[in-house]
């Protein structure tokens, strides 16, 4: 029996990145031998065991043979005669097909070290094309390591295109697509994930609402980058700088979906695109089974981001009504989330990356003023039932009006 550290732990250590999870491959052993040594079996489809002390995963070396469609259609073979090289060959990328023995020596049968040095994401073998989930995984790795200047090898991107055009991605379940997307949204450069999907044709298949934005022009005065798809990826990049939250980043990604519905004869204007995009946000989220709390914010951002841009022109009643509409009284975090997504929208434009966004500050200040109006004082004044709500709203409007007069500049 020989045990090797494999995959991501080896890769990230070589890149000088923090190692989170460690996975091990066991060569020359059997399930019974592992059980006798005190390991606990957890793998249902192939032999994976938990170490009795560390609880890290130890998998018997195995090969995989395509036996059906999609990313689950594989037959596994695990036996003592499966070599380490056999096991590493089934992995997706060469940089993930590295192993380390107990002496610290790196085993590299597929030139993963060279590709690490050259910052290349390259598939190990043609078997890559048998698993459509790998298209998403490579896009996610490209996003994860973009800050290290990694790029996808030409032949790997070509294979990803072939897989997409062959309809392989249609076998992916919504849950797996969302899981990979959610993971990509946590990276430093989530926009790279969607750009890679577009480069291989997968964006049109998995995110048609986003793909439809490319080639749709916006007014050059407000959008020097012109193309709404490019603007969308720029805003996502900016959102990633402003917030680590997946819901903020996803809502920013979806904020302009309504522009894809504008008839070409009305281009480059997109009047009412915010509310129009709400249905597309719901359609995308329902198809991918996106969690409700993420859907809820994306819906609100699509509907209200343009309103926040015009904040100095809003009357106090409209401002308080906005807080009602986003349910800020019960979910105050939404004020900050809307401020961040709206700022990402404005700064996600060519030449505006360092622009100030005072509307975000005014939104936050107005919220502090509105929420500081005490409910207790209204009740103590003798108001009852529905009158309490009405009087509280009236006092909030008055407080915001007073604040706006002093703090918010009047529109030209």
Curated annotation (Swiss-Prot):
Keywords: ATP-binding, Hydrolase, Magnesium, Metal-binding, Multifunctional enzyme, Nickel, Nucleotide-binding, Nucleotidyltransferase, RNA repair, RNA-binding, Transferase, tRNA processing. The keyword Nucleotide-binding applies. GO terms for biological process: RNA repair; tRNA 3'-terminal CCA addition. Monomer. Can also form homodimers and oligomers. CTP binds at residues 8, 11, 91, 137, 140. This is Multifunctional CCA protein. InterPro entries: CCA_bact, HD/PDEase_dom, HD_domain, NT_sf, PolA_pol_head_dom, PolyA_RNA-bd, tRNA_CCA-adding_enzyme. Belongs to the tRNA nucleotidyltransferase/poly(A) polymerase family. Bacterial CCA-adding enzyme type 1 subfamily. It comes from Escherichia coli O6:H1 (strain CFT073 / ATCC 700928 / UPEC). A single active site specifically recognizes both ATP and CTP and is responsible for their addition. It catalyses: a tRNA precursor + 2 CTP + ATP = a tRNA with a 3' CCA end + 3 diphosphate; a tRNA with a 3' CCA end + 2 CTP + ATP = a tRNA with a 3' CCACCA end + 3 diphosphate. SUPFAM superfamilies: Nucleotidyltransferase, Poly A polymerase C-terminal region-like. ATP binds at residues 8, 11, 91, 137, 140. GO terms for molecular function: ATP binding; CCA tRNA nucleotidyltransferase activity; cyclic-nucleotide phosphodiesterase activity; magnesium ion binding; phosphatase activity; tRNA binding. Its EC number is 2.7.7.72, 3.1.3.-, 3.1.4.-. Its cofactor is Mg(2+); Ni(2+). Comprises two domains: an N-terminal domain containing the nucleotidyltransferase activity and a C-terminal HD domain associated with both phosphodiesterase and phosphatase activities. Magnesium is required for nucleotidyltransferase activity. Nickel for phosphatase activity. Residues 228-329 form the HD domain. Mg(2+) binds at residues 21, 23. Catalyzes the addition and repair of the essential 3'-terminal CCA sequence in tRNAs without using a nucleic acid template. Adds these three nucleotides in the order of C, C, and A to the tRNA nucleotide-73, using CTP and ATP as substrates and producing inorganic pyrophosphate. tRNA 3'-terminal CCA addition is required both for tRNA processing and repair. Also involved in tRNA surveillance by mediating tandem CCA addition to generate a CCACCA at the 3' terminus of unstable tRNAs. While stable tRNAs receive only 3'-terminal CCA, unstable tRNAs are marked with CCACCA and rapidly degraded.
């Amino acid at each position: 029996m020989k045990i090797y550290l494999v995959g991501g732990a080896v890769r990230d250590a070589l890149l000088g990145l923090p190692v989170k999870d460690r996975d091990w491959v066991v060569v020359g052993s059997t399930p019974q031998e592992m059980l006798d040594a005190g390991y606990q079996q957890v793998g249902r489809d192939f032999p994976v065991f938990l170490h009795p002390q560390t609880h890290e995963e130890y998998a018997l070396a195995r090969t995989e043979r395509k036996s059906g469609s999609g990313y689950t259609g594989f037959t596994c073979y695990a036996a003592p005669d499966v070599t380490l090289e056999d096991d590493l060959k089934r992995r997706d990328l060469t940089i993930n097909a590295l192993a380390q023995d107990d002496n610290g020596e790196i085993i590299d049968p597929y030139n993963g070290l060279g590709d690490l040095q050259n910052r290349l994401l390259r598939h190990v073998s043609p078997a890559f094309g048998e698993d459509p989930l790998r298209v998403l995984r490579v896009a996610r790795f490209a996003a994860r390591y973009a800050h290290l200047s990694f790029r996808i090898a030409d032949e790997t991107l070509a294979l990803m295109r072939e897989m997409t055009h062959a309809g392989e991605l249609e076998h992916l379940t919504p849950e797996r697509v969302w899981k990979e997307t959610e993971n990509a949204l946590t990276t430093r450069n989530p926009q790279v994930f969607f750009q890679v999907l577009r480069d291989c044709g997968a964006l049109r298949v998995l995110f048609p609402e986003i793909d439809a934005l490319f080639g749709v022009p916006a007014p050059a005065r407000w959008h020097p980058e012109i193309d709404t798809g490019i603007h969308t990826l720029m805003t996502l990049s900016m959102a990633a700088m402003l917030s680590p939250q997946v819901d903020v980043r996803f809502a920013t990604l979806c904020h302009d979906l309504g522009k894809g519905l504008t008839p070409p004869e009305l281009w480059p204007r997109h009047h009412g695109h915010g509310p129009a995009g709400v249905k597309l946000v719901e359609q995308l989220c329902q198809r991918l089974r996106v969690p409700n709390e993420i859907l809820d914010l994306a819906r609100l951002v699509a509907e209200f981001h343009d309103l926040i841009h015009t904040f100095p022109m809003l009357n106090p009643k409209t401002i308080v009504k906005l807080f009602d509409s986003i349910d800020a009284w019960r979910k105050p975090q939404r004020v900050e989330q809307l401020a961040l997504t709206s700022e990402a929208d404005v700064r996600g434009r060519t030449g505006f990356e360092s622009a100030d966004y005072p509307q975000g500050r005014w939104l936050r200040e107005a919220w502090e003023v509105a929420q500081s109006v005490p409910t207790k004082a209204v009740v103590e004044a003798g108001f009852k039932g529905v009158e309490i709500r009405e009087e509280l709203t009236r006092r909030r409007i008055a407080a915001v009006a007073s604040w706006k007069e002093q703090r918010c500049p009047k529109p030209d």
